[in-house]
């Protein structure tokens, strides 16, 4: 009897430690915002094909003595031209995580609760992503957060991540920062100046500002987008610092 009670207490303690913090904001089983009581912004960069922002982004982060989180696909990790940049990010203390091996679309845009991949296909792609990260010293233990490709997922994807020992995270909606990849010939094109103004307007008009925000940007974009938002990163960080914010890796405090 005593052993049973002890076991129950241990399991309850472990569950409490592993449960998401109540201050986190969840959507479809994924964390989409950190602690809303802290003036902390989590800069998140994703990459699949392009890395043209690497020099600018890393230099700006260094200038601000800030750390960020970088979620790359397996294809990105395997690209020889990106190896040096990835190692530099790791060396400078930034978070490296997964973003799908082949940048799969998990669910239809028009019917999010459906699936375009089976559980087996998803887990196989996930393992391949982490296999590509291993040469850089990145494992599930060192990098337990996963950001879904296309930033599009549902409850099933979140649950499969959890079953694989990972926590799904995604950008905080509201600012449109994730549109920094769009190109002029597309109908959804968002100029960098408009994105910049939306971020600051959101901060000023909401009670919790950008507290706990996972602010997603892209590590590089298509050559057709010459108006690169990462060229505004220094100004954005400077302004947010003036407003009392600090920057940390994903969900670090």
Residue ranges: model-predicted function:
Residues 199-251:
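Catalytic grooves of carbohydrate-active enzymes
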Residues 52-55, 124-131, 197, 231:
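Short, contiguous clusters of charged residues that form electrostatic/catalytic patches at enzyme active sites
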Residues 51-52, 79-80, 155, 223-230:
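Loop/helix-junction capping segments adjacent to catalytic residues or to phosphate/diphosphate-binding pockets
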Residues 58, 130, 134, 158, ...:
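Non-transmembrane alpha-helical segments in soluble domains
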Residues 40-41, 62-190, 208-221:
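Metal-dependent polysaccharide deacetylase catalytic core of the NodB/CE4 family, i.e.
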């Amino acid at each position: 009897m005593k052993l049973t009670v002890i076991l129950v207490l241990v399991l309850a303690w472990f569950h409490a430690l592993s449960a998401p913090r109540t201050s986190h904001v969840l959507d479809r089983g994924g964390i989409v915002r950190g602690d809303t009581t802290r003036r902390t912004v989590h800069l998140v960069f994703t990459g699949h094909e392009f890395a043209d922002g690497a020099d600018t982004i890393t230099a700006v982060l260094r200038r601000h003595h800030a750390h960020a989180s970088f979620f790359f696909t397996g294809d990105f990790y395997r690209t020889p031209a990106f190896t040096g940049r990835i190692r530099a990010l790791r060396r400078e203390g930034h978070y490296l995580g997964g973003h799908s091996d082949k940048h799969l679309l998990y669910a239809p845009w028009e019917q999010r609760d459906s699936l375009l991949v089976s559980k087996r296909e998803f887990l196989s792609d996930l393992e391949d992503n982490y296999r590509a990260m291993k040469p850089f010293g990145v494992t599930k233990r060192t990098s337990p957060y996963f950001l879904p490709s296309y930033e599009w997922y549902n409850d099933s994807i979140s649950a499969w991540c959890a079953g694989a020992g990972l926590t799904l995270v995604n950008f905080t909606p509201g600012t449109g920062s994730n549109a920094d990849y769009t190109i002029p010939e597309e109908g959804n094109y968002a100029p960098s100046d408009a994105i910049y103004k939306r971020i600051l307007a959101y901060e000023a008009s909401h009670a919790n500002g950008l507290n706990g925000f996972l602010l997603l940007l892209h590590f590089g974009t298509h050559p057709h987008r010459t108006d690169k938002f990462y060229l505004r990163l220094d100004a954005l960080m400077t302004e947010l610092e003036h407003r009392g914010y600090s920057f940390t890796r994903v969900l670090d405090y």
